[in-house]
């Protein structure tokens, strides 16, 4: 994905295309440096702004962290 025009608050923050378990694709701000194939958790809505280093960033989806291990019962 190439995004040349952004709102001022996004600056040079990375953006990632995420796919949920139903196949829906969304774009999220990525302050943690996730890579393709990583499992991540996200913050959405107004909480997404506070997951960014600068809470003034205008976003409604932010990657909050990379999941290193996940066990499902």
From Swiss-Prot:
One of its GO terms (cellular component) is carboxysome. Pfam families: EutN_CcmL. Keywords: Bacterial microcompartment, Carbon dioxide fixation, Carboxysome, Photosynthesis. CDD domains: EutN_CcmL. It is found in: Carboxysome. Homopentamer. This is Carboxysome shell vertex protein CsoS4B. It comes from Prochlorococcus marinus subsp. pastoris (strain CCMP1986 / NIES-2087 / MED4).
